[in-house]
Amino acid sequence: MCVDVPCENCIVRNDGLRLKCSECAEGSSKLFPRQNRQHSSAISHISNSSPPTRKRSIDGGYTSGTDSANTSEIVIKKRLTFSKKSHSTSEIETWNAHLQVDYHLETVTPSCSTVYQKITSETLIEIMQKLSQIEFMQKYILIDCRYDYEYNGGHIKGAQSLFNPETAADFFFNKDGSKKINRIPIFYCEYSQKRGPTMANNLREVDRKLNSNIYPRCDYEEIYLLEGGYKNFYAFTRGLEKEQRVQLCEPDNYVIMFDDRYKAELRKHQFHKKNVSKPMKKWSSTTSVISILTTSGTRISTLRQTCDPIHEHDAH
């Protein structure tokens, strides 16, 4: 056995490195026991140690065992995300896209509609007296939704008659769908409970259809409804001087819808017959389809008519 000098069993390479035989290697371990124990201990640690654990992550990859806390947090977040219904970007944008209207007139609160706001007779009279007739007509358009005999019997001065919902599209829009009237509409009927709100809703439905590509924007965004209708307006003017009344009502008179003198006229209006032929009932919202056909054939559109809640006895 040899330690420093190679024996006959050892192999010496050309570069001078000696490869010890088994006897020389055993003798070397006896001479340097501590060094060999450290070496063997290191080898034992390496051979016995297991590779780092890897866990399957929720998104298909792997994470090391040292990141178990972070992995748990990620898994929880992922599960919460997956538990919620996914929605497209267009749906989210549509939900957030509400029409914002800056109503410059004093309105009645709380609001009862997303289409229009109500104003009182006092507010309307104040505007009519503050502005000249030309100034008022340049900014506003009064729409009387009562039947022609009611309108002719007495209406708000400067108001235009429009009682047929099927003509709303042609009244407010040109044949090419562009805006026809550059004024703010104010609707009313006898009580402003049925015909006035219906006409305002029809205007918004047609507006939405023609401007669907720029939703939620509309051509007629600011819309008003006269609270209490012509009945309340006429009653309010009774407290004014005669000179003031004639500037507000034209003629200074009031004809109710069920006036016995106009029974034959009332029967001519198919719109009213369709609504009073069936028992009236309360509802929060209803939809009926009205087809608007123009004789020129340039526009054929279908709108959904949405009515406000009404009373069982009301057909106005």
UniProtKB/Swiss-Prot annotation:
Alphabetic keyword roster: Cell cycle, Cell division, Hydrolase, Mitosis, Protein phosphatase
Location of region: Disordered: 35-65
Gene Ontology CC: cytoplasm; nucleus
Domain of life: Eukaryota
BP terms from Gene Ontology: cell division; G2/M transition of mitotic cell cycle; mitotic cell cycle; positive regulation of G2/M transition of mitotic cell cycle; positive regulation of G2/MI transition of meiotic cell cycle
Pfam families for the chain: Rhodanese (PF00581)
Tagged with keyword Cell cycle: yes
Intrachain S-S bonds: none
Membrane-traversing stretches: none
Its EC number(s): 3.1.3.48
Family per similarity comment: Belongs to the MPI phosphatase family.
Name of the protein in question: M-phase inducer phosphatase cdc-25.3
Species annotation: Caenorhabditis elegans
Lineage of producing organism: Eukaryota, Metazoa, Ecdysozoa, Nematoda, Chromadorea
Gene: cdc-25.3
